[in-house]
Amino acid sequence: MTEEVILKVGLTPKHQCSYLGHEQEQLLVLMDHSLLNASGYERLLTAGFRRSGNDIYRPHCPACNACQSLRIHSERFVPSRSQKRIRQLNQDIELVLSYDDKPEYYQLYERYIRERHHDGSMYPPSRTQYKGFLHCDWMPPLYLEMRKDNRLIGVATTDLLPHSLSAMYTFFDPAHADRSLGTFAILSQLELARRTGRSWLYLGYLVEECRKMNYKRQYLPHERLIQGEWKNIDSKPE
């Protein structure tokens, strides 16, 4: 943030971390409703906060700082050879933008969770769960549809902000897993940011020790929020 802002926040009770099972998780939750708008949220993103449903939070764990906010500059990003291949592979995909949450989205989400994440905390899927973390009353998310021959095979949910995008969640038809639609969704959001003159795509938190969260480091160069400062990372760790 470019100016000092005093935030009213709450602190959640400690509980086992869903990313690192040996750690205790605790979150700061924003209580100041004056910042619940697109520009306010964008400022909070630069300070390491994140949206889930209507709530904005940031990790505040007692003995761990593994979560690092990560963002990619839309003009500086250089796709790797494999990312170029994935983009080429999906040239036959039609991308459609929508602010309407269509019934077919949840049907696809439910199938995705049941087949891809049946061993995780999001199983079993439900409409309440789906709406609880994707929907937002004060800022409707943008849905990036991926269609093959007019059939919905993937959806990336993202927040469209004044100067950036914030990727929320991507789900897809497990029958098309060989297309690497998760990677394609991020590449498509980067292209959307670039075409609309938005500088950044925020990807949420990177957790190096967690396989489900460390895939984000493959998008280079990127920036990570480390000890309150955004640091440029232009190479993969050894």
Swiss-Prot record:
It catalyses: N-terminal L-glutamyl-[protein] + L-leucyl-tRNA(Leu) = N-terminal L-leucyl-L-glutamyl-[protein] + tRNA(Leu) + H(+); N-terminal L-aspartyl-[protein] + L-leucyl-tRNA(Leu) = N-terminal L-leucyl-L-aspartyl-[protein] + tRNA(Leu) + H(+). GO terms for biological process: ubiquitin-dependent protein catabolic process via the N-end rule pathway. GO terms for molecular function: arginyl-tRNA--protein transferase activity; leucyl-tRNA--protein transferase activity. InterPro entries: Acyl_CoA_acyltransferase (IPR016181), Asp_Glu_LeuTrfase (IPR017138), N-end_Aminoacyl_Trfase (IPR030700), N-end_Aminoacyl_Trfase_C (IPR007472), N-end_Aminoacyl_Trfase_N (IPR007471). SUPFAM superfamilies: Acyl-CoA N-acyltransferases (Nat) (SSF55729). Its EC number is 2.3.2.29. Keywords: Acyltransferase, Cytoplasm, Transferase. GO terms for cellular component: cytoplasm. Transmembrane segments: none annotated. It is found in: Cytoplasm. Functions in the N-end rule pathway of protein degradation where it conjugates Leu from its aminoacyl-tRNA to the N-termini of proteins containing an N-terminal aspartate or glutamate. Belongs to the R-transferase family. Bpt subfamily. This is Aspartate/glutamate leucyltransferase. It comes from Aeromonas hydrophila subsp. hydrophila (strain ATCC 7966 / DSM 30187 / BCRC 13018 / CCUG 14551 / JCM 1027 / KCTC 2358 / NCIMB 9240 / NCTC 8049).
